[in-house]
Amino acid sequence: MSDSISVIKEKLSEVTSENDPFFQKCIQDERKGVEKLVQSVRRKWEKEAKLLVKLKEMTQYETDLFQQGYKYIAGVDEVGRGPLAGPVVAAAVILPADFSVVGINDSKQLSEAKRDALFEKIKKEAIAIGVGIIEHDVIDQVNIYEATKLAMCEALNQLTPEPDFVLIDAMPLRYTEAELSLIKGDTKSISIAAASIIAKVTRDRLMQMYDEKYPGYDFANNMGYGTKKHLLGLDTIGICPIHRMSFSPVKESKLHFDSLN
């Protein structure tokens, strides 16, 4: 083959099958550069095949429910149970039956750029999205477990149309009789994964905003979790208005600064 490496790379970007005549010619090309391109294309196809398998696995619950006659299946997930500051945020998402986005997964396993791109995709294509935000003071009043349930119910209450089946990550909600709680549901259900992404991006953006309002805790990077920089902020500055007073490190910081007065 007389084509240059750069030309071959360009042509291979449009090849989709091992049986493509051009790809077969590339296999026969003994140049090291072409061999590397062939290996790269094969790795790309292997990755894409795995993502398609994962997508099929993650739509299985929804597919079964659609076949049973359910029309509006809501996935529900939360983010922010563990942080020392900020709200707990839950999202509920109803996706159309033909929603098919390769790469969607538990939000914690995705890069920020990938989450942001999927966030926009979900917002554009979802039938309905609800977001529940329960602030730090309510968390202190009712405990984080109950606050999480409140956030989930708030998110579900915002959905129009109302869901006729609810898939929930991990915790039983008892929002409706037609619901199923899935352990690690954000890796098993595309609806829950979508809710996970909506909740994560929503809360991260809130915490980035709070970082500007309350500097010194590194909220933009730790999202309120108890990292070294956050704990250092508690030790040197004390608490701020969005800290959860019922969480031990925050409580200890307040006691320390109160004792100095």
Curated annotation (Swiss-Prot):
Coiled coil: none annotated. Keywords: Cytoplasm, Endonuclease, Hydrolase, Manganese, Metal-binding, Nuclease. Its EC number is 3.1.26.4. One of its GO terms (biological process) is mismatch repair. A divalent metal cation binds at D77, E78, D169. Gene3D superfamilies: Ribonuclease H-like superfamily/Ribonuclease H (3.30.420.10). It catalyses: Endonucleolytic cleavage to 5'-phosphomonoester. Pfam families: RNase_HII (PF01351). Its cofactor is Mn(2+); Mg(2+). GO terms for cellular component: cytoplasm; ribonuclease H2 complex. It is found in: Cytoplasm. One of its GO terms (molecular function) is manganese ion binding. Manganese or magnesium. Binds 1 divalent metal ion per monomer in the absence of substrate. May bind a second metal ion after substrate binding. It is an enzyme of class 3 (hydrolase). Residues 71-259 form the RNase H type-2 domain. Belongs to the RNase HII family. HAMAP family: RNase_HII_B. Endonuclease that specifically degrades the RNA of RNA-DNA hybrids. NCBIfam families: PRK00015.1-1, PRK00015.1-3. This is Ribonuclease HII.
